[in-house]
């Protein structure tokens, strides 16, 4: 008897659930894939160090994200990058305000290189033109407008050493070599590496400090 009663209750609840379900006609329209996954109209605005120019990301006529730049008093901007495939996702101003720096990989391989666009000439330079490496900008400082620190696994694919990059010439000099367990570096206001973050065998994190650039 109890079994039949339980079955009856379940049947009633099952039928009631159909009545509580709204029909497809009552549902709001589906959000389009373009809204969910498409490019934004404009995003990631960045003002130059001297405060005279504004840069942002926006799609070009082929819907590829590019960097756009304009003087702050001008209404319309112009495209300064010309990527043909995946578009630009990450960029920043150089401290001298005459160069846009951006990261780009090749066909989604995530081996990002550091590029620079000279705004006066429009020329693009790959500052890390080495096959199979991955690079990133580690630090910049307004007191050193022609220099940045770049991390790159050129010497050993497992280690990301820090290199000092001169933007005007493209010269790269090894600044700080990474130990096996180091995963990140931090620079001070003089653009000197002063701290390293390392991972312990147990999965923890330790911070190593040094007094100056000559210290290990």
Predicted regions and their residues:
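Bacterial N-terminal signal peptides
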Residues: 9-19
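Multi-bladed beta-propeller domains
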Residues: 25-41, 70-89, 107, 118-135, ...
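Beta-strand-rich domains and repeat architectures in extracellular enzymes and scaffolds
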Residues: 34-65
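Hydrophobic beta-strand positions that form the internal "hydrophobic ladder"
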Residues: 51-55, 98-101, 147-148, 194
């Amino acid at each position: 008897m109890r079994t039949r009663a339980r079955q009856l209750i379940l049947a009633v609840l099952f039928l009631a659930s159909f009545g509580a379900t709204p029909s497809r006609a009552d549902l709001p329209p589906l959000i389009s894939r373009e809204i969910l996954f498409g490019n934004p109209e404009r995003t990631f605005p960045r003002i130059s160090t001297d405060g005279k120019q504004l840069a942002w990301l926006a799609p070009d006529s082929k819907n590829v994200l590019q960097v756009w730049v304009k003087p702050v008093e001008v209404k319309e901007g112009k495209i300064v990058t010309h990527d043909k495939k995946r578009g630009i996702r990450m960029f920043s101003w150089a401290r001298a305000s005459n160069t846009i720096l951006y990261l780009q990989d090749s066909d989604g391989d995530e081996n990002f290189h550091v590029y620079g666009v000279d705004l006066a000439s429009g020329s693009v330079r790959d500052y890390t033109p080495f096959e199979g490496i991955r690079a990133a900008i580690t630090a910049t400082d307004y007191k050193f407008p022609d220099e940045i620190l770049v991390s790159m696994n050129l010497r050993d694919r497992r280690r990301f050493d820090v290199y000092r990059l001169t933007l005007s010439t493209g010269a790269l000099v090894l600044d700080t070599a990474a130990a096996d367990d180091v995963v990140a570096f931090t620079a001070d206001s003089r653009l000197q590496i002063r701290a390293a973050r390392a991972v312990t065998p147990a999965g923890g994190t330790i911070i190593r400090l040094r007094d100056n650039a000559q210290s290990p």
